[in-house]
Amino acid sequence: MKFLRNLILSFVFAGAMSMTTSANADCKVHLGDFDWDSANIHTAIAGYIIEKGYGCEVESTKGSTTPIMAALFDQQIDIITEVWRDNLVQLIEDNLAKGTIVELGVNTPSSTQGFYVDKPTADKYGLKSVEDMKKPEIAKLFADPEAPGKGRMTSCISGWTCYTINLVKHKVYGLDKFYTNFDPGSGGALDAAIAGGFK
């Protein structure tokens, strides 16, 4: 673990990696990877640099947010290269305060989460807020073929923290009376659903 302290690679917040020039050929680094594309890319790049540039043995474990973050906090995983802080604010703040993890930087500062509607539809129907989505005639525009009488809001994948956040928001905003919180099942299916909305 001395190597990890030298590199200061305990926790990479939202992706940016920061390394010193220290190297150790007898090191092992355990990376945590997630089940979405940008995290996979960042983890692969970090693994390549650590292995080829520093001569370390690299192990990578892939999973959903909850188990990977738990393993990071328990120090079973050394590095993650991306995390959505808004989804885990208290856990991250607590572990930063305890010194369990170290924040090194940000690589995607403009990343945001929320409910989105394509601009042509929003402009045509005057959609400006969540309240507008609760009109029955608007919900019909997004009909869920598996839930007659309700619209479909394509959510995050079950296992991602944002899925639970969206589920709570549906109930708090009263959207659950009009829409399903649809789990697309995979990152690829989520991408396809978003792209399909513009056809």
Region roles according to the model:
Residues A71, D78-T81, T154-K199:
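Ligand-binding pocket segment of bilobal, Venus flytrap-like solute-binding proteins
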Residues T100-S155:
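A conserved helix-loop-strand patch within extracytoplasmic ligand-binding domains
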Residues L7-S18:
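Bacterial N-terminal signal peptides
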Residues T43, G63-G99, A189, A193-G197:
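Pocket-flanking alpha-helical
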Residues T20-S22:
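N-terminal signal peptide c-region/cleavage motif recognized by signal peptidases
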Residues A46-Y54, D132, K140-T180:
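Ligand-binding cleft/hinge of the Venus flytrap
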Residues M1-N6:
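Positively charged n-region of N-terminal signal peptides that target proteins for export
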Residues A25-S38, C56-T61, G149-T154:
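Short, well-ordered beta-strand elements
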